[in-house]
């Protein structure tokens, strides 16, 4: 459920796009396979940490076919500095095996195909689609969720319903808005001590957190 007027929504959208016009994901990847692995690893883990892990990972498993044949212990060792590495290692191998078996070794770029893979939920699928295919989809992580609620763009209690509210509010440029909101939440509208004084959305903010020290 949206809480802002159409005028406010359009202004918020315009400012986010203006301030993050050329921004891309901070994850480092070269192709769709690497993108999917990075996004799967990034759950409950910082992009910086993922970027430290992946060079050795991709040197060991340069394609989905190599990962599909990987030894579980080897994958765990390579990603052990990442949160929930045990589950992620299992899902990475299962994901790769499914891509080889069901998609001829090519990571699918449709939502149903992606969500059929182990460890891939709606958020992960949407990030892969917007980054890998330029799809007009929204993805809600912890930063986007926080920003959406502080700006009064949603009252929803789940990421999925928040995604629906944002998609209905913004309609277009959803991928760019997702990336802008991620970076805005990461560096300006932080969970603790948000930088309200230098915020380009300050006067449009409806959050109680606006006066945080």
PLM region descriptions:
Residues 2-213:
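Catalytic cores of DNA base-excision repair glycosylases
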